[in-house]
Amino acid sequence: DGKDLAGKNNAEVSQMLRGQAGTSFKLKVNRPNAKGGNTPMEFTIVRESIQNPAIPYAAVLDNQVGYINLSTFSGNPSKEFKKAFLDLKKQGATSLVIDLRGNGGGLLDEAVEIANYFLPRGKIKQASNTYKTLREPLDLDIPIAVLVNSGTASASEILSGSLQDLDRAVIVGSRTFGKGLVQVPRSLPYGGTMKVTTSKYYIPSGRCVQAID
């Protein structure tokens, strides 16, 4: 749109290209040609909403080990997970690694839904509410290992902790983040906002996943 991008860094260029989905901008580039010069070219780019997949990678590794990298619990990752898992089983996977490293959480219901795939009908607790695994599981016997690290938080800790507490998976990695509280924003006078802790997450053994300073 007539703005020069020369000399700008990636963050500055990215900021200039962002906009509402459905809007467009003109991008003019100089493409090197066979004569040693540049050929100016102009493109009209239409912006679209970008949604990163909840499962950026899934594959059958050596020794028939299925691997699923689950990056978020936002959106509808349980459907993506189910499809990926069933595809791995068709490819011959006899064990499963669920990679939750760097997964900061998302929707608790999605974590319960994925736990449902590997647990008999039971309970996962959250404060005074009870979340039940209601559907028939996909596989009660496949060996599972869950990878975690300091970036594993919230719904990720609920899933990994529940699978561990119910003797359904082995947890491998470092200490997780410890995000076990629920905050609700409250409006304050003069436009301020305060987050108030209203509840805690508990996994089946009764442990709260919140870190203690």
Give the label of every model feature segment.
Residues 205-213:
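Conserved functional hotspot residues or short segments at active or partner-binding sites
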Residues 2-189:
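Cleft-lining beta-strand/loop regions that shape enzyme active-site pockets
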Residues 190-199:
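Short acidic, Pro/Gly- and aromatic-enriched capping/linker segments at domain boundaries
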